[in-house]
Amino acid sequence: AHALANDALAIGTTASATGESSGAIGTANTVNGAGTYVIGARNSAPTTPVASNGSNITAVNSGVFGNENTLDGENNRVTGNSNIVKKETATGLTDIMLTGNNNTVSGDTDTTTQDDAGKVSGITITGSKNTVKAKNNTKNLTDVQIVGNNNTIDTSNKALDLSNTQILGSNVNATMGNSVYLGSGSAYV
C-alpha cells in the first residue's frame, strides 16, 4: 500500500492514494484525486488520465464503495459494483449519484464532435443496468432521476433535450425530456 500525499490513507494489497486527503482501502484500488475515498476492490479514481482497469478516468471530491467501478468528474458518488461514471467528451461531469450495479453515466465517445459537448450533471440512479449517455449536441444533460432497472435515456435524436427526466419503473427507453415515465415499459406517445 502507498499513501503518498498529505493526509492520504492506503490500506490493502497494491492500494495507492496519491491525492491530498484521499484514501484507498482494499485490493488494487487507485486514488489520485484530492478528497476522494475508495473502498472495495479494483476501483480507480485518478486525477490524470492513466490506463487503469481499461479506462482513463478522473475524480475529485468523490467516493466509491464497491468493486470494479470507474469514476470521473467532481462531487460524484458510487455505491455498488461495475458502475461507470466517465466524462468522455462532456464539458463537465458533476453531482452524479449511483446506487446499484452495472450502471453507466457518460458523455459521448465520439471525439470528432467534442466541441459540441454539453455538461452532464444532477444524475441520480437507484437500480441496475441503467444507461445515461449524453450526445455531443451542445445541450446539457441535467436533472435526471431513475429508480428501476434496465432503463435508458435515449439521446440519439440530437435535436431533443433529455434534461429533467424522471423514470420510476424498469425497461424504459426515455426519448423525451422534461417528462415523467411511470411504470415498467412505459413510453412517451
Segments (PLM) and residue ranges:
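Glycine- and small/polar-enriched repetitive beta-structure motifs of secreted/surface proteins
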Residues: A1-V189
